[in-house]
Amino acid sequence: MSDVRVIIQRDSEREERVVTTGTTAAELFAGERSIIAARVSGDLKDLAYEVKDGETVEAVEISSEDGLDILRHSTAHVMAQAVQELFPEAKLGIGPPVKDGFYYDFDVEKPFHPDDLKAIEKKMQEIQKRGQRFSRRVVTDEAAREELADEPYKLELIGLKGSASSDDGADVEVGAGELTIYDNLDAKTGELCWKDLCRGPHLPTTRNIPAFKLMRNAAAYWRGSEKNPMLQRIYGTAWPTKDELKAHLEFLAEAEKRDHRKLGSELDLFSIPEQIGSGLAVFHPKGGIIRRVMEDYSRRRHEEEGYEFVYTPHATKGKLFETSGHLDWYADGMYPPMQLDEGVDYYLKPMNCPMHNLIFDARGRSYRELPLRLFEFGTVYRYEKSGVVHGLTRARGFTQDDAHIYCTREQMSEELDKTLTFVLNLLRDYGLNDFYLELSTKDPEKFVGSDEAWEEATETLRQVAEKQNLELVADPGGAAFYGPKISVQARDAIGRTWQMSTIQLDFNLPERFSLEYTAADGAKTRPVMIHRALFGSIERFFAVLLEHYAGAMPPWLAPVQAVGIPVGDAHVQYLEEFAAEARRKGLRVDVDASSDRMQKKIRTQQKQKVPFMIIVGDEDMHGGTVSFRYRDGSQENGIPRDQALAKLVDVVERRIQV
């Protein structure tokens, strides 16, 4: 046997090793149980891969990002095998890894029942213990069609070879190169137990799956299109250790308690009535108070920063979106047109920027007016697929705190710097403090404008982001078609990351709208345009804050800031007078004068997460005092009325959490 030379890469260390022809990646890392795959000259491979002369081989640990994807993808295969063993009529869809887990789609006669999921999980445990080997096999298109003749969805995927998309998970099954099938082989006999069309790579055996759990099932359209059949999707999660699985399940339990949809109902804040439609929320009085306070504070801060408020309609002629390019690039995300005025197409607006451009262009502009900062709480409508609509965080109708800044190229860097600083400070005012930044750059397949303009815009944004001394993460190809952007990513109280504000530099739309201002030398000049949404949308930010605070909003945002609780009927009038005085100071204070016993009143207000309970008994009435009871159950007694009012006002004005 001849020798081959390979380079083994571990972090920054490189080791050259001479091995015999036919040596596998598994042999290179023999005895290292945490290594479950290899990256060979940049491509992920199974450990069964035979290394070739001159290749660079990197170990893939099960706890790495690649390793977790492989673990979860292999677990999805085990789940699909279990389903077909229990439900032989089930037809296979797609089963990719996703964030923190995996799913697989099945065409079955009836939806899965919770008891079915228990049976499937038990069968998966049996398969895991069998230690079946994952074995890769290259097949021709014709052979694949013959082998998978009873799997109609797999046959469709074979036809996508070379054009499969990551959007629907199809690219985990077929790529641009050779077709492969993964066989699950009996550990002792090598006999075929199950197989699936798949690109891989996979774990060496099913025994390499340390910990998993099935989470739920849901309906899902085949490949995400509502024109396709409805399938049944089972979601699961898999982790390198049982302790990590336990920690993840505890995290999910905490996240479920904080789910804004659950809290929205329990606290009577908002609802999404079926009669109105999916993704279209209505805010109840208490939710309306929170939203109004959020908007009022944002409006005041924007005025202080030199923004000018504008208002635009909800619908427009389609010609406007032809000019902006949205009909070329964004039509799938828009509601269908309404034909009015003898066949003229009108659209609900998905974005505010084209209308703001018309405001800029309504009259001649001078360089002395720049930067011009136009701001609007603008409601937009986007046709999100039903499968991705999620409460207030992914809606079909929502209001953006949308600003468009027009400036000279010389002002561009300073304006971006001011904008990002303003954005971060305003988010901190609402109680978010843990950030990192993401820089989204050009998608080579989907952009307008010149390469030079994109390069200039991207480099300017990079420099502005780096000034903030926050972590900066690259998002290659993630920008919208009209310009690169900075996204502010915020971590909430339980460590989840939310994309919040976006700041997008745009050299394209001023060209499309022929926007001009008169420069100091009298020349007509194109302005630079900056898109900026701080909350993203009011609805989404409302949901993020609700989950961040687990419904216990800080007093300045709470719909009811304090509730008076009388020890007895004789104390109601005293509390009503206190509440009236508090309301005159701008506080939101109620009195619970119901016939319920005091302890029940306290429990009721605790469930409603009211920041302060104002308790009054005989001693308080005679001494001109009140007692504060806080959310954590602690109490402060005998506070003079004036001091109590002053404290409430101070806590609200300073936006302190209690």
From Swiss-Prot:
EC number(s) from the headed UniProt entry: 6.1.1.3
One Pfam family linked to the record: HGTP_anticodon
Cofactor notes: Binds 1 zinc ion per subunit.
Protein's cellular compartments: Cytoplasm
Classification via PROSITE patterns: AA_TRNA_LIGASE_II, TGS
A Gene Ontology molecular function term of the record: threonine-tRNA ligase activity
Residues that, per the record, bind Zn(2+): 353, 404, 531
Keyword Iron-sulfur: no
Major subcellular location class: cytoplasm
Top-rank taxon, per record: Bacteria
Catalytic activities: tRNA(Thr) + L-threonine + ATP = L-threonyl-tRNA(Thr) + AMP + diphosphate + H(+)
Keywords: Aminoacyl-tRNA synthetase, ATP-binding, Cytoplasm, Ligase, Metal-binding, Nucleotide-binding, Protein biosynthesis, RNA-binding, tRNA-binding, Zinc
Swiss-Prot/TrEMBL cofactor(s): Zn(2+)
CDD domains named among the record's database cross-references: ThrRS_anticodon, ThrRS_core
Similarity comment: Belongs to the class-II aminoacyl-tRNA synthetase family.
HAMAP family attached to this UniProt entry: Thr_tRNA_synth
Subunit (UniProt): Homodimer.
Physiological role: Catalyzes the attachment of threonine to tRNA(Thr) in a two-step reaction: L-threonine is first activated by ATP to form Thr-AMP and then transferred to the acceptor end of tRNA(Thr). Also edits incorrectly charged L-seryl-tRNA(Thr).
Protein name, as recorded: Threonine--tRNA ligase
